[in-house]
């Protein structure tokens, strides 16, 4: 912006211009400017320009040249300076220049305006042009120029002294005005912006002064309180601190002076290592105490058993009984090159268990009384026999009763039943039937045959048997072991059986094999009536403990194996040479682990807080494994399942409901497994319990009713069981995966018998799955003509239903190339059209007339 050069008034005695007559004291102010009370003259255009800037109107205005108003403004030396005076107040953006911009009434210069470089501004340019024009007008009157030159030079020197640029020479400045530089204006703006920022910072700091004063007072108060507290602590705790420091100083020289201290530290380290080995927590101590108590009980039981064996009780004669005596005898008789085992105890004598005479078991030694005569030929059967027979009074002391010796037999070819072989034994007690404790796999049938009398004992077991048959004295004893049949590849021409004796150490010591001819196999084929599928591999007796929590001793494992084999044995009736009638009985005994687990679950069902999480988990796992092992195998025996159900019901009805519907990790219950194995006798027992949930779906989304579509119905009893299952459940329920019903699954797998049973139970044939398919569409797609006929025979069958693709059953049959089924559907459609009611316009007479 342009800066105005202020020329001071001439001092007294110096030549100066005369007072211009153009400024009378009482003349009116020119209308283009206004005079302030302090003697300033402000241009009205400038005031309007400032007002526009404040209002935001910064549009460039067109410069209009005004002609000088000669009538209102007097022509004089100072008349041209009027417009230039307006720049005095706002001529510079720098506050330092305002101190030298004095525009007094009597200090107006007549000429020589000082111009400085600044930014381009139309208002300033117009003012400068006006001033130059006025100077040109007065250039013709050279009055007073000589007197003004020194003063002008002095003013210029003064401006240079204060830092202002020198004035433009008269010869060139007015003719060619120089606009202000942009750099100077930018510098001024930066200074103003910096000053404003600093001012704002100072204002903010001033506002923070009261807050800082409050904080300072708070800190001073806290400092005072902490000082008082520190003084009190020093006063109270100084003696203790002094003693602590003195004790520390006394302890430092002890280790190097006394070597005994090092030994003391080593002893302390040994104690800490011992402590680290101890269990932490009351739970660990309780568990250890429980283990020790269990071991103590086992040791006491073994001690009592040893004392009982050492005792030599004398046989006593008992008075003759009033009624017939019931005699149970167990005997295992194998074919050629097999071992004959007889185990019994005298009536009234303490129970005698077969004990190990050697470090490793080599067989079962016969427990027989001395002086026994040879028994007549007997028959071998897969059953435990309980026979009612009279016993003479003289032979009362020789009556024997069976004790718990379990032997498990597994067939290598999965046949329904093994041939029954009669045999003669020199060590069999008189008046008793001999049977073998074996475990059949498929059938309850039996075929008694004559067993050859030739025997070839094996290893030490044969010699021990011969010694017992000879009537050696002393308390009888034998090897506690489990007879296990090892699976072998089935031979199409011969049936081989392999027996292995498993000692308490779990090792196999001796084995025996026998072979039977092809005729025996043909006999077995006649007894196969319940095995719908190939036999699955079932864990043997020796492998059974792997499904249960492992024991702490090998003896416990052996006892558990014996109990498991007793629970699962399935034995048909035996026939003696005398032809006496016998009654069938299946021995069932719950293991102690299963009993304790059932009792624990019963407590939990009555009170959910009665058991801890660990106890509940152990009980649940035990019951689940035992129940699934018992009822979920393909060869599960229905009578054994029924007796377990009776036992569970006797304990608690809620326990029965819980056990029957217990599911494994895949959501399958015993009913799921029994139906999938087509073991419908077990299914019948489960349904008779009254608590079986027949609509329970597994994780795959299938219920037992749906799984019936995969089973094969062989007998009429199976069909009756399936019908009972269908009546108890919802036969129209959909699977969670594809929305298929039991009828759709049976149709897809081509189970005609199951389809008939479902239709007999009024299954809905028009139910659609997630894809919109019906059972009739499934039959058309898979080409089951017979099933399609059964479905079309249902009056409610709708053949006009469409799936998601808009296809009907007829279209599906045509796409699948099933022309016969398509013709059946077409005939059904024509029959429906012929029986449909016709109007008068569609009568046969009218149609024939049209033709």
Swiss-Prot record:
Phosphorylated by casein kinase II upon estrogen stimulation. Phosphorylation induces the release by KANK2 of NCOA1 and its translocation to the nucleus where NCOA1 can activate gene transcription. It comes from the Eukaryota. The modification Phosphothreonine is found at residues 168, 329, 472, 552. Strongly expressed in cervix, colon, heart, kidney and lung. Expressed in kidney glomerular podocytes and mesangial cells (at protein level). Residues 183-234, 282-312 form a coiled coil. Changing residue 676 to F: In NPHS16; loss of function in regulation of the Rho signaling pathway; no effect on cytoplasmic localization; decreased function in podocytes migration. Pfam families: Ank, Ank_2, KN_motif. InterPro entries: Ankyrin_rpt, Ankyrin_rpt-contain_sf, KANK1-4, KN_motif. This is KN motif and ankyrin repeat domain-containing protein 2. The lineage of its organism: Eukaryota, Metazoa, Chordata, Craniata, Vertebrata.
